[in-house]
């Protein structure tokens, strides 16, 4: 499985981010391209230990069971629900380059920190994840949204 802790996989995502353009057309979903980048950035801050979301009630009930559908080689399903904490609406299209650069910096920090520094804080839906599960999930999350905008 692809994993942001793997250098080749990390570089693939960084290259796809580099090729992302502000005028890329959304293929599905509701977020615009800048909201999507900000969403990815905030979500990557959880395993980096920069934010600490509360567990969703539904996640406490079924998160462990559903986790297997996400921690695998299959692409994430389109139009999956998004935790409200990760829905970013108060951002301008002018922030595209800033958010794109921030994404590259956060990915690099995640990789450089290594598994040892991965936060133990539970995922808001899936609960406790190992560092490798975080790496796989984050790679898939970036892949999902980059495909959403054709990158």
Predicted regions and their residues:
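Long, hydrophobic N-terminal alpha-helical segment
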Residues: 1-39
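Globin-like tetrapyrrole-binding proteins
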Residues: 1-6, 17-18, 28, 75, ...
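Metal-centered catalytic cores of metalloenzymes
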Residues: 2-5, 103, 151
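Membrane-proximal intrinsically disordered regions of secretory-pathway and membrane-system proteins
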Residues: 6-7, 105-107, 139
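Short, contiguous alpha-helical
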Residues: 24-71, 120-151
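Conserved, structured core segments of small domains
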Residues: 25, 103-110, 117-119
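Short, helix-capping/interhelical loops that line the mouth of catalytic, cofactor-
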Residues: 51-98
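Short helix/strand-capping connector loops at secondary-structure junctions
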Residues: 81-88, 116-129
């Amino acid at each position: 499985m692809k994993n942001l802790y793997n250098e080749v996989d990390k570089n693939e995502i960084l290259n796809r981010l580099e090729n992302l353009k502000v005028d890329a057309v959304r293929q599905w979903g509701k977020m615009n391209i800048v909201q999507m980048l900000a969403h990815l950035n905030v979500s990557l801050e959880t395993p980096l230990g920069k934010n600490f979301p509360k567990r969703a009630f539904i996640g406490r009930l079924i998160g462990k069971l559903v986790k297997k559908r996400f921690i695998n080689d299959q692409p994430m399903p389109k139009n999956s629900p998004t935790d409200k904490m990760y829905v970013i609406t108060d951002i301008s299209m002018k922030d595209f380059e800033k958010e794109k650069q921030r994404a590259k910096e956060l990915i690099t920090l995640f990789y450089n920190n290594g598994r040892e520094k991965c936060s133990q804080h539970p995922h808001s839906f899936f609960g406790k994840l190992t560092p490798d599960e975080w790496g796989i999930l984050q790679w898939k999350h970036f892949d999902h949204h980059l495909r959403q905008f054709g990158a």
